[in-house]
């Protein structure tokens, strides 16, 4: 995904998220060294997946965001101004029971479709 913003450009997350009408949206905002910051606007459930080489950090701007951790058998619930990191190799899925805006900080190598091959968007049932 190409970055929407370069260095020395103002990024207004609230304005960007407010313009999103889709139930599932993912945009790379900018690149910082070998990492990217992505904006996610979502409602629904993403499929189970893991990243072999990359860690991820999720930060909630608005809404409610759930991260299910398969091996631990637990769910982490995040509300605005809370964040959580998922280390490489951990099988997880994310859920947003209501419209939720998040920022994701991850390696530029992370494929935002999970393990790859799946469509970007909520899990299919």
Where in this protein do the model-derived segments appear?
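Amphipathic, hydrophobic secondary-structure cores in small proteins
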Residues: 47-53, 58, 80-85
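Ligand-binding loop in jelly-roll beta-barrel domains
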Residues: 88-116
């Amino acid at each position: 995904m190409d970055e929407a913003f370069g260095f020395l450009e103002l990024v207004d997350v609230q304005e960007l998220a407010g313009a999103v009408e889709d139930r599932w949206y993912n945009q790379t905002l900018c690149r910082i060294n070998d990492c990217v910051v992505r904006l996610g606007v979502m409602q629904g459930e993403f499929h189970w997946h893991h990243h072999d080489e990359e860690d991820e950090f999720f930060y909630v701007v608005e809404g409610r965001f759930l991260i299910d951790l398969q091996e631990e058998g637990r769910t982490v619930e995040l509300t605005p101004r809370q964040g959580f990191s998922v280390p490489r190799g951990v099988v997880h899925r994310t859920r947003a029971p209501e419209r939720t805006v998040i920022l994701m900080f991850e390696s530029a190598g992370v494929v935002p479709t999970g393990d790859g091959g799946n469509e970007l968007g909520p899990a299919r049932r």
